[in-house]
Regions:
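N-terminal alpha-helical interaction modules that lie
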Residues: 1-65
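"A position-specific structural signal for the A-helix of alpha-solenoid helical repeats
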Residues: 4, 8, 67-70, 74, ...
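Alpha-helical repeat scaffolds
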Residues: 21-28, 87-93, 121-132, 158-165, ...
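Boundary/linker segments of alpha-helical solenoid repeat arrays
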Residues: 33-41, 102-106, 133-141, 168-181
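Alpha-helical adaptor scaffolds
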Residues: 44-45, 59-86, 90-143
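Terminal, low-structured helical/coil segments at or just beyond the last alpha-helical repeat
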Residues: 158-192
Length: 192
């Protein structure tokens, strides 16, 4: 079978919720496309090529036109829907091997870490992402993730400030909800 046929088969397995078969298929596709230990990049858009070259200090990589990273990412989302966060995280790790600068992959990884209770790793991963951030929405999410860490660590003052700060970059209902929760828990309003 050629790659296009395998991609269609992957999509059929995934659509019919045969996730193990879909996983085997995307692994087979990935194995077919790997190039002698050379770094690969499945970019979503041109800016990702620039980000990759800048942050990883190399132009020695293989640009792959097949969306292997998206296949792993979509499979991870299916596992997350089924509350299989360990398997989802594994697939997101593989997705990141194919696109090391795709913020969506990393944000999903942080969501898995939250569900797995891996708070230290959540904070570390989130902080590592700071260098890749170039949108207001992503910087806001960055601060919400750090705020989540402080909520879980029972440091509501820091969390409240970080949620407020995230809203300065991109207002979100999530941050508003968390601020309201913290205001109720602390018995006072958040300073402006």
């Amino acid at each position: 079978m050629n790659i296009e046929e395998n991609i269609k088969l992957f999509q059929q397995y995934q659509k019919s919720n045969k996730l193990e078969k879909a996983s085997e298929m995307v692994d087979a596709i990935a194995d077919t496309l790997k190039t002698d230990g050379r770094t690969v990049l499945c970019a979503n858009h041109i800016l990702e090529f620039y980000l990759f070259e800048y942050y990883f200090k190399t132009r020695d990589y293989e640009a792959v036109r097949y969306p292997v990273h998206r296949m792993y990412h979509s499979l991870a989302k299916k596992y997350m829907e089924r509350m299989h966060f360990d398997k989802a995280y594994e697939k997101l790790e593989k997705a990141a091997e194919w696109n090391r600068v795709d913020m969506d992959i990393y944000w999903e990884k942080t969501e898995c870490l939250k569900q797995l209770g891996e708070l230290k790793k959540l904070k570390e991963t989130t902080k590592e992402l700071h260098k890749f951030i170039y949108t207001r929405a992503d910087i806001a999410r960055y601060y919400r993730n750090i705020a989540y860490y402080y909520v879980e660590k029972k440091e509501p003052e820091k969390a409240m400030m970080l949620y407020t700060y995230s809203n300065m970059f991109s207002h979100s209902k999530t941050a508003d909800s968390e601020i309201n929760f913290l205001e109720t828990a602390l018995g006072r309003e958040c300073p402006e």
